[in-house]
């Protein structure tokens, strides 16, 4: 971690019978007496993989959001249960630990993000609505080209929303989503940011492109 922040990333486990939705994280209980740790962020991620070119559209986004909600549980009771298990050895860690839903999109081909995606939404009172009350971390890894042709954000309102719905939430350091966008990704690597080394060190295995002609595309 950095500045006393410990980040733990592990896959979701415990798929339900009805759908492939993990409701636990493959992480043992945290050790007691973690000196110098100011904040602990635990990400339970689910992989959506493909061996073909992939388009991230509203249908796939809806499926992912449903899975994230199932992971956190209504009112966050499942993520709260994970938190209690992780901090069982040292209850003082509970106030410093958060459990986040993570999403990893992988493809051995190209990935095109064609639909606007807001990782957080707002309720009727203008407050941020997130799975378990925590940001969602998003990792997109295309072995070839990754094209972001629609806006991607974490909780910022669309400018054409109603003026009466003013979010009382303020942007606070450390509470936003982590976004990792990788073209030419090395899918065999444990590091989600790893890329494939090109044979001649000039031509990349894949590219990351943000934007499209005559359209505002914002990643924020």
Predicted regions and their residues:
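Extracellular and secretory-pathway beta-repeat/beta-biased strand scaffolds
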Residues: 1-220
